[in-house]
Amino acid sequence: MCPVIMGTDKHHELGVGVSAIWSPMCDRFGIDSPIFGFAHDIETVAAITNAGGFGVYGATRRFPEEITQELAQIRSLVGNRPFGVDLVLPPGMPEHNSREAIQAEIPQEHTEFVQQLVERFEVPKASKPGMRTRFIRSKEIEQAQLRAVMESDVDMLACGIGAPADVVAQAKDRGKTTLALIGSPHHVPKAVAAGVEIIVAQGYDAGAHTGPIGTYSLVPQIVDAAGDIPVLAAGGVATGRHIAAALAMGAQGVWLGTAWLLSKEHQGDMHRVNRDKLIQAGSADTVITRSESGKPFRQVRTGWSQAWEAEGAPAPLKMPYQDVLVGDLLGAIEEHDIEPLIHSGAGQSIAYFNDVKPVAQIMQALIDETAQALHTQQQFLRL
């Protein structure tokens, strides 16, 4: 079980003399709180780190030269404080970055369905490639992205949908901590064999790519299976009560993504329609669909997910074919403000976030609430 130490602060408003939470993750990385935050924009990542957590930059959709530049930008914003980068490294991707080769294998039924959506919602053509078709997810681009990461001074490499042993070894040789996000206890032996140093147990509640097992059921199983490898809990973590529960289940910290979607720092990358939909969304307003990328992906339910769930819709293709099929359309939807189809990845914890706040304020609330929850739990002990 991960020890948690609570500090004191005369200005604390809880009335319990507590203002800090601690786990071995804090000493390992020199952070103030064991809260790891994932985001797709550099301002939010830097703000998480500067607020005493550990920011992680989602760079899967970035060109290698962009990764180099953006990691340097984050470093300039955080100084010597630690931060990480996340890449999705799924097995079975094509060798080369060839759009034509992928398009040639897409069934006509799927192409016609996408065209029907274009006509039904009167979507003009995109003026530039969409986020999912700027390049084709392939081993070629993956290797170039990894070179950019390895040549940077980023402190951690987080691997999603696979953590290849050779990549883990290379990162460790470069002095970078390695982390794998997994959604099933069955994935633990492979992660351990690959040599990862931290495991994120990501439950079904989580936004974006996620697995089939609920966080409450998943975390203790992965903690038990991981042995001495520390585990972070992810999926549905939105308040200090969730963090306290994660620590009680044996996690040494938490990994949050949805919590930052409505942060002030993130709004530069947030479409106004997405922001409004996220503010209004409850836990039941999210849905898991393969229509986004070909992998299970939790997002806010909109006309997009409903169209792919409708009778007569084709089954989404596997990654990266679904990316190529829908990528340009998804880009056009946001570019031209097609409101019924605009959507965002988000976890079930979105119900807890209904206005825009600075990252530092979100972080402090999480710390205060965790301390309060841990203090309150002591009443259930009879010594």
Model segments located where?
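Conserved active-site-proximal phosphate/metal-binding subdomains
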Residues: 103-113, 212, 217-232, 238-383
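Active-site entrance/lid segments in N-terminal catalytic domains of soluble metabolic enzymes
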Residues: 2, 7-225
